[in-house]
């Protein structure tokens, strides 16, 4: 699959996977800006757009939207930082610079710096759905058992 990428900063690094089996692609920060106390914005230095081939391959004969998601890296715990909206959605029509905003919730821990891998990017497809209001839902094995219902 092909995704068009435009470098907006000469230091931009094209997202990459270390291992073929990796699910997401690592993204490297090219700049940092403190937006508010302990709120940091990291620009990635590029813009993305799904290629026409990718759109046609994925969409096929059904109506769907393509997006990319930014996700925290598994090592984020070492920084005391939290991606501001946990998973950021980048809609197919957005062609601006991709950036990630983090809250530095544990300021005594180190935070990300320029040239660090700060997040991961993933490709997703959203098929159009219609919500249908009903009076009852079909019974399931889990039922209404919520938080913690599967045990430890």
Where are these regions (language model features)?
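DUTPase catalytic domain/fold
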Residues: 1-152
């Amino acid at each position: 699959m092909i995704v068009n990428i435009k470098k907006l900063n000469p230091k931009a690094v094209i997202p990459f996977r270390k291992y073929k089996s990796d699910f997401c692609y690592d993204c490297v920060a090219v700049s940092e800006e403190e937006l508010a106390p302990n709120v940091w914005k990291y620009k990635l230095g590029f813009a993305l757009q799904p290629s026409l081939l990718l759109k046609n391959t994925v969409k096929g004969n059904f109506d769907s939207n393509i997006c990319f998601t930014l996700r925290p890296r598994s090592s984020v715990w070492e920084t005391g930082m939290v991606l501001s909206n946990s998973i950021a959605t980048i809609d197919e029509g957005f062609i601006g610079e991709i950036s990630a905003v983090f809250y530095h919730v544990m300021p005594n821990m180190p935070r990300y710096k320029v040239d660090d891998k700060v997040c991961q990017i993933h490709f997703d497809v959203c098929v159009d759905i219609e919500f249908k209001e009903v009076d009852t839902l079909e019974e399931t094995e889990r039922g209404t058992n919520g938080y913690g219902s599967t045990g430890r």
